[in-house]
Amino acid sequence: MEKAIRNFLSQESAGGILLLVAVALAMLMANSPLSGLYQGFLGTDVQVKIGELDIHKPLILWINDGLMAVFFLLIGLEVKRELLEGALSSVAQASLPTFAAIGGMLVPAGVYLLFNYGDPVTQAGWAIPAATDIAFALGIMALLGSRVPVSLKVFLLALAIIDDLGVIVIIALFYSTDLSTISLVIASLAIAGLVGLNRKGVTSLLPYGILGLILWVAVLKSGVHATLAGVIIAFCIPLRAKDGSSPSEGLEHSLHPWSTFFILPVFAFANAGVYVGNMNLETLISPVPVGIALGLMLGKPIGVMVFSYIAVKLKLAQLPDGVGWKQIAPVAAMCGIGFTMSMFIASLAFEHADPMYGDLARLGTLIGSIMAALVGYFWLSKVLPNKGV
């Protein structure tokens, strides 16, 4: 278990650096003479036509709907493993990160709505600061090396996974529109097929892949966000085969490098390019970026700490071994690193609104996430013992 966590964290730390490079490159291109090339590249029409099936979208939507579905497949595999065998497999292990994650979603959403109350357009972005970017958060923590107790790393990992699960539910309930009955019926049949494969003990990934592709297309056409197909597929792939092998973990290990070093950097590059040349102080202090930035910088740590404290005081949860509140507090600050997950929700929340709102949301996400990363890193560095960095 500990070896798996260490391998996960080492990969996430490298991935976090690559994400930063992708974000910096996107911002550089969006605010330079290369801006036209950048926007033109993301707007490139890509069409897939097979018989009556016709999917025609700009490249950025293929990234957000297609590549991110694979990312959510990986999240689903991680969540299933942790629920059945890992850090969330018992009530005692799952209680504290669960309460922390709930607080870390509710309070930032409340902060955002406080600044955007009464505006039906901007209110749609309430879930943006509720997300935590697991790659960035774990990557920042990994920079502190062996000074960080494994139990603290497991706490952040479990919290982030529950947060991801919450984001999945939010997307399903609040960001699905114009539902197509026929597509939903096809999706339901595909899900029934996937469940049937699981019940029959099929361990070959090929039939899951075929039905999964059908499910993705059906969900894409249904009005429900296509990334949810990845989660459903993940939950249907068996964790253990009769011979003791794990099809689920095998796929997870295969997908993880692709997600860390390709999918998330590509997503960050495609979505982080905010043109700031036409922005001024009035823009920066408008409700959307302020609500998101403060939701991430203040709402996240306050929500995580308050809900955790209440849970421990009511004896509904307990602190990890060898970890006190002075270590939990900076980790709570790190949970405000929203980056790719917050940007993804922003792309859904303002998909049909003026593009300006998307730019403002990304700007708020960048400011809030960077501040949360800096505060979390230096705070945690200060409270940890100075040994073997």
Curated annotation (Swiss-Prot):
Main location: membrane
An example Gene Ontology biological process: regulation of pH
Coiled-coil residues: none
Membrane topology recorded in Swiss-Prot or TrEMBL: Multi-pass membrane protein
Keywords for the protein's UniProt record, in alphabetical order: Antiport, Cell inner membrane, Cell membrane, Ion transport, Membrane, Sodium, Sodium transport, Transmembrane, Transmembrane helix, Transport
Gene3D superfamilies found in the cross-reference section: Na+/H+ antiporter like domain
NCBIfam families the UniProt entry points to: NhaA (TIGR00773), PRK09560.1 (NF007111), PRK09561.1 (NF007112)
PANTHER family xref list: NA(+)_H(+) ANTIPORTER NHAA, SODIUM ION/PROTON ANTIPORTER NHAA-RELATED
Listed name of the protein: Na(+)/H(+) antiporter NhaA
Origin species: Shewanella baltica (strain OS185)
Classification of source organism: Bacteria, Pseudomonadati, Pseudomonadota, Gammaproteobacteria, Alteromonadales
